[in-house]
Amino acid sequence: MAKKVEKLVKLQIPAGKATPAPPVGPALGQAGINIMGFTKEFNARTADQAGMIIPVVISVYEDKSFDFITKTPPAAVLLKKAAGVEKGSGTPNTTKVATVTRAQVQEIAETKMPDLNAANIEAAMRMIEGTARSMGFTVTD
């Protein structure tokens, strides 16, 4: 019989840099799971994506065992990396801080496709373009 999920914990952790310190430790400690076991496994799985923030969904079962699913990095993080900026605009409709090309948007959409609720790559690109515009980025051909 399948184990019963007791709790779902969602976190965003830098790839390969999970430590028992906050925010990871307290979130997992409340769920009652082995923090060191999680951090070692997470760091091993995400070592190749250094520098990215990786969303992770941890399923905690009744017997305090766990498993986790890593997602693709947030679109905003990928856009900032593609544009080479530290942060988006504070006033995106008046102040544009960077420019991304449609080719970069397509590359990001292809990366994000497994996690997006989009039927095809064009729909995924429109979602990424919307995120870019809301961050004060200009999308060019």
From Swiss-Prot:
Keyword field: Methylation, Ribonucleoprotein, Ribosomal protein, RNA-binding, rRNA-binding
SUPFAM superfamilies named in the record: Ribosomal L11/L12e N-terminal domain (SSF54747), Ribosomal protein L11, C-terminal domain (SSF46906)
One of the record's GO cellular component terms: cytosolic large ribosomal subunit
Record-linked InterPro entries: Ribosomal_uL11, Ribosomal_uL11_bac-typ, Ribosomal_uL11_C, Ribosomal_uL11_C_sf, Ribosomal_uL11_CS, Ribosomal_uL11_N, Ribosomal_uL11_N_sf
Domain of life: Bacteria
Stored Pfam families: Ribosomal_L11, Ribosomal_L11_N
Gene3D superfamilies per record: Ribosomal protein L11, C-terminal domain (1.10.10.250), Ribosomal protein L11/L12, N-terminal domain (3.30.1550.10)
PTM per Swiss-Prot/TrEMBL: One or more lysine residues are methylated.
Gene Ontology terms describing biological process: translation
Tagged with keyword Membrane: no
Listed SMART domains: RL11 (SM00649)
Keyword Ribosomal protein: yes
PANTHER family, alphabetized: 60S RIBOSOMAL PROTEIN L12, LARGE RIBOSOMAL SUBUNIT PROTEIN UL11M
Quaternary structure and partners: Part of the ribosomal stalk of the 50S ribosomal subunit. Interacts with L10 and the large rRNA to form the base of the stalk. L10 forms an elongated spine to which L12 dimers bind in a sequential fashion forming a multimeric L10(L12)X complex.
Family classification: Belongs to the universal ribosomal protein uL11 family.
Role of this protein: Forms part of the ribosomal stalk which helps the ribosome interact with GTP-bound translation factors.
This protein's name: Large ribosomal subunit protein uL11
Taxonomic lineage of the native organism: Bacteria, Bacillati, Bacillota, Bacilli, Lactobacillales
Gene: rplK
